[in-house]
């Protein structure tokens, strides 16, 4: 499937964003470990969270988590502490995404996990019965989801969990988000210093829980505000908390110097909202370390290129093990639009302002990656007509993305 996008002349809209996928998936695992009966409220309706809900309810085997990397990691730990044998499998791409570091860590704690096909990669056969816990050391620069998966099972282990992180710790806001949710459900879990986290052996408490809306989804609306030529544009996004524990709430500070002003307020019903308006761009070049907000990188890279702002972005090492190699994908697709990017050290992207000719009728490949589709869609403000291949990938995190764009005035034609 392919769609053609044309941007609206004016941008004035109020949008209800989807619930946070990151919070939903963590809350569901913790809720299950707590033995809760009523699901958390405002759970995300995206593919990844649907897969998580289905897997937690499924009684037969194997459990197909499709392309949901979060589910693969969190459920590997979850099923290790629950009785029975479960096989976790997924898409062809999922079977190429390494999971050996997490499996080795779980085995160190006593888990019984076998690789069904290829050593170090899914599918996994997990025989439950991990109960002891104890001390564990992990590199800090692995996926934060490995760390979160281990932390969340800590309270149900007899000895709890003491986790040491060595080297550079990346994506720390996601670890902090996990610790916050654990505490919200009654666990005692905290950093004891910059390298160590201690989780006490104290069972979770079933707790009514409401999930806030998604700051990652908000980033695409920030991009639209930055790129629209409408100087009077105004976007209101509902359900976003100013004091959010989501790491991607940093988006409002990131977009401030490139022309987007954020105002926090509550509407007449008391619902927290943000109002986005345009302001002058206050920089000629940008440098930023995305080590703590890797999921914002695609949006920000594309936005800066479209604005003609040279940049050097670091801390991108985790982008290579996401739904696709996002560094390579960004280089290939922005080249189609006339922006030759360069990679350095496997963790940096930079653009010096050089332009090349735009390919006629550019079609953006999405690589089974929802964030590629959503980050490139607003390019139609700059490139008059742009095409997106396999647009349905947005269902992974923001199922109603294209509907919301139509509501604000984008012309979207299925071809």
In which residue ranges do the predicted regions lie?
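Short, structured segments at the rim of ligand-binding sites
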Residues: 1-415
